[in-house]
From Swiss-Prot:
Binding site for ATP: 100-102, 109, 244-245, 300
Protein role: With EpmB is involved in the beta-lysylation step of the post-translational modification of translation elongation factor P (EF-P) on 'Lys-34'. Catalyzes the ATP-dependent activation of (R)-beta-lysine produced by EpmB, forming a lysyl-adenylate, from which the beta-lysyl moiety is then transferred to the epsilon-amino group of EF-P 'Lys-34'.
Catalytic reaction list: D-beta-lysine + L-lysyl-[protein] + ATP = N(6)-((3R)-3,6-diaminohexanoyl)-L-lysyl-[protein] + AMP + diphosphate + H(+)
Subunit note: Homodimer.
Keywords, comma-separated and alphabetical: ATP-binding, Ligase, Nucleotide-binding
Stated name of the protein: Elongation factor P--(R)-beta-lysine ligase
EC number(s) on file: 6.3.2.-
The encoding gene: epmA
């Protein structure tokens, strides 16, 4: 394909046909298990507060809103899907577009396809097993292995991420030759993420998918804190062949705790000179009304298809990446 023929799709037609077959297979997987497919908005009046996520923003100027209404493209359908759970929809899944105003590259595109699903009355481990089932079916891979976040750091970096102070984390960073980044970073979780990315990720999920679970409580996001060890959150991620595929939680259902986390995120954003984001009060109201105890997971479909097809980059499995959009 000519480099100058930018009207043409990024992916080949055979790859797009294979992608369509995988989408059908995913829907069949959930239909066979009685999980309802839902559709939720791509835009919202509120957005994520996470300091590491950057949403696209637009304005609605239609009738009744001549002064304009700020809207955000969804980085994930999570908040709307949790409102459906609180309304009594039962187990739900969604295949949808998500948007993040971040990087573009081998594994990233600002517009991407997300598979997200929620299972009432599932704990984190039961959902991990279901994710493993889906990966084996779509990728024809071996059953996954599991490591706690603590075990992964101890195995590959010989450091305990739950007890190490920032000086010890910087010493570990020096051994990985990333002191130029670590020495000026004051946020402990950012240091941990740096070490995980550089020192752990390259060593896991090579032959089979690998689940990393029980992230530090400070990285709980929307997950519950473990009742067995308050230092960790009921959160997991799964990696395969150098790619992060999914991020899952035993979901937080306490509205007050969730609001406190949103507010803490905004304080961190302010400290970093980032804009504070509007908190989703609809989600908080849904939690107050009573969302069932559940676990949920978000999985990057484009990355899944890339692995299934043995492709080298997302552009090989997306019809039009942002540079051709």
């Amino acid at each position: 394909m000519s480099e100058t023929a930018t009207w043409q799709p990024s992916a080949s037609v055979p790859n797009l046909l294979k992608r369509a077959a995988i989408m059908t297979e995913i829907r069949r997987f959930f239909a066979d298990r009685g999980v309802l497919e839902v559709e939720t908005p791509c835009m919202s009046q509120a957005t994520v507060t996470d300091i590491h996520l950057f949403p696209f923003e637009t304005r609605f100027v239609g009738p009744g809103h001549s002064q304009g209404m700020n809207l955000y493209l969804m980085t994930s359908p999570e908040y709307h899907m949790k409102r459906l759970l609180a309304a009594g929809c039962g187990p739900v899944f969604q295949l949808c577009r998500s948007f993040r105003n971040e990087e573009m590259g081998r594994y990233h595109n600002p517009e991407f396809t997300m598979l997200e699903w929620y299972r009432p009355h599932y704990d984190m481990y039961r959902l991990m097993n279901e994710v493993d089932d889906l990966l084996q079916q779509v990728l024809d891979c071996q059953p996954a292995e599991s490591l706690s976040y603590q075990q992964a750091f101890q195995r590959h970096l010989e450091i305990d991420p739950l007890s190490a102070d920032k000086t010890q984390l910087r010493e570990a960073a020096a051994k990985l030759d990333v002191s130029n980044i670590a020495d000026t970073e004051e946020d402990r979780d950012t240091l941990l993420q740096l070490l995980f990315t550089v020192g752990v990720e390259p060593h896991i999920g090579k032959e089979k998918p690998t689940f990393i679970y029980h992230f530090p409580a400070s990285q709980a996001s929307l997950a519950q804190i473990s009742t067995e060890d308050h230092r960790v959150a009921e959160r997991f991620e799964v990696y395969y062949k150098g790619i992060e595929l999914a991020n899952g939680f035993h979901e937080l259902t306490d509205a007050r705790e969730q609001q406190q986390r949103f507010e803490q995120d905004n304080r961190k954003r302010a400290a970093r000179g980032l804009p504070q984001q509007p908190i989703d009060n609809h989600l908080l109201d849904a939690l107050k009304a009573g969302m069932p105890d559940c676990s949920g997971v978000a999985l990057g479909v484009d990355r899944l298809v890339m692995l299934a097809l043995g492709a080298e980059r997302l552009a090989d499995v997306i019809a039009f990446t942002v540079d051709r959009a």
